[in-house]
Amino acid sequence: MPSMDIVSEVNEVELRNAVDNSVRELKSRFDFRGKEASIEYKDHVVTLSAEDDFQCQQLVDILRMQMSKRNVDPKSMDVDDKAVHSGKTFSLRVKFKEGIETLIAKKLVKLIKDSKLKVQSSIQGDSVRVTGKKRDDLQAVMALAREADLGQPFQFNNFRD
């Protein structure tokens, strides 16, 4: 009986590469010449700091663009609402969503059940296990999960036949 797990993970290596590319772009951008701005990555948190709130938002856009280039879904970003002002710099903290929260998992299971596909889905910690009789049903669930706008990207692993 085919089964798979629906998870939400961020590829650590690709994320680090995206941050490094963002730092490189920051150093070469003309509008940041002579300005004090930085992008730092530590313990699954990216800290963006700049002299102005507008520049912090530009740094977020740079990071999003580089993440897209490295195939890391920007939906996994959880950006602070307001930049923290300390001294002469503004800083934003960007955290990344790991695992599927219980509320989102319940919505996903309900979405799968409402689709009338012949599959069973169950919440297992921070992932959702889906089993069905046919591989085509699981592929339909994959398409359904990708289309669903639940504010979080999903990956599929442990696909067994």
UniProtKB/Swiss-Prot annotation:
Gene Ontology terms for molecular function: nucleotide binding
Q: Which organism is it from?
A: Shewanella piezotolerans (strain WP3 / JCM 13877)
Q: What is this protein called?
A: Nucleotide-binding protein swp_1151
The entry's function note states: Nucleotide-binding protein.
Q: Source organism lineage?
A: Bacteria, Pseudomonadati, Pseudomonadota, Gammaproteobacteria, Alteromonadales
Of which family is this protein a member?
Answer: Belongs to the YajQ family.
Give the CDD domains listed for this entry: YajQ_like (cd11740)
Q: Which HAMAP family match?
A: YajQ
Q: Which InterPro entries match?
A: DUF520, UPF0234-like_C, UPF0234_N, YajQ-like_sf
A cellular component term (GO) from this record?
A: cytosol
Pfam families reported in the protein's UniProt record: DUF520
Record keywords, A-Z: Nucleotide-binding
